[in-house]
């Protein structure tokens, strides 16, 4: 369907006007604006429209592409389409990009298809990497709190993701302040680079 790579010459001045800020206390810099793949990257959006959005973003210094395993429609489709774009146009720019993905919402049926168990998170990350066509993501987030799974298990799964080289940083999304503080303490104790 797509040739492996195609010529894309990004704007040579793409970094001149974008502001980049450190993510938390890490050394990672994120652009002031990120490109979220929640909408406009599912199976109902024409590929040329997706390509135009990504090119416009990157040409303006937007280097953070934010995904989740369930973004679509259909679940997983945004990661698949991002993977096609990366393979076709951004192969030589991977080190200029911060690719993040998340897991926590329902992705498949049965008792292991959502929330925060070690089994779900690590399986989800492997599936996301396959859809994206990548060896690693820059940030792997737990997408929502899971009151029924011990926080130590969920943070341990994020630690495993980083220690295995499948993620560079761990992140948390949709956590309340109290739980975020506890999770941060666990990640710090495990020496896991944590950005958000």
Stretch-by-stretch model annotation:
Residues 44-58, 114-133, 153, 180-185:
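Short, acidic/polar
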Residues 22, 30-34, 63-64, 96-102, ...:
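Structural preference for beta-strand elements that scaffold enzyme active sites
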Residues 1-97, 163:
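N-terminal binding-site loop/beta-alpha segment at the start of enzyme catalytic domains
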Residues 2-17, 145-196:
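Beta/alpha (TIM)-barrel catalytic core signal, keyed to glycine-rich beta->alpha loops juxtaposed to Asp/Glu
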Residues 129-149:
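Active-site groove signature of glycoside hydrolases
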Residues 36-48, 106-122, 143-149:
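Active-site mouth loops of central-metabolism enzymes
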Residues 38-40, 68-70, 102-106, 142-145, ...:
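Active-site beta-loop-alpha junctions enriched in small/polar residues
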Residues 60, 91, 130-136, 161-166:
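A structural motif corresponding to the C-terminal end of an alpha-helix
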């Amino acid at each position: 369907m797509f040739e492996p790579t195609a010529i894309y010459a990004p704007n040579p001045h793409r970094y001149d006007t974008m502001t980049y800020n450190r993510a938390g206390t890490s050394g990672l810099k994120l652009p002031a604006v990120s490109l979220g793949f929640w909408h406009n990257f599912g199976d109902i959006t024409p590929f040329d429209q997706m390509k135009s959005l990504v090119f416009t973003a990157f040409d303006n210094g937007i280097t953070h592409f934010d995904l989740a395993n369930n973004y679509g429609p259909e679940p997983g489709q945004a990661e698949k389409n991002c993977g096609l774009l990366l393979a076709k146009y951004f192969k030589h720019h991977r080190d200029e990009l911060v690719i993040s993905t998340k897991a926590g919402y329902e992705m498949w049926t049965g008792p292991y298809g959502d929330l925060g168990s070690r089994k779900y998170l690590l399986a989800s990350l492997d599936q996301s990497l396959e859809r994206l066509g990548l060896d690693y993501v820059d940030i792997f987030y737990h997408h929502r709190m899971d009151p029924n799974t011990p926080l130590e298990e969920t943070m341990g799964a994020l630690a495993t993701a980083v220690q295995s080289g499948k993620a560079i940083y761990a992140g948390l999304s949709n956590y309340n302040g109290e739980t975020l503080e506890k999770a941060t303490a666990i990640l710090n104790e495990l020496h896991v680079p944590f950005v958000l």
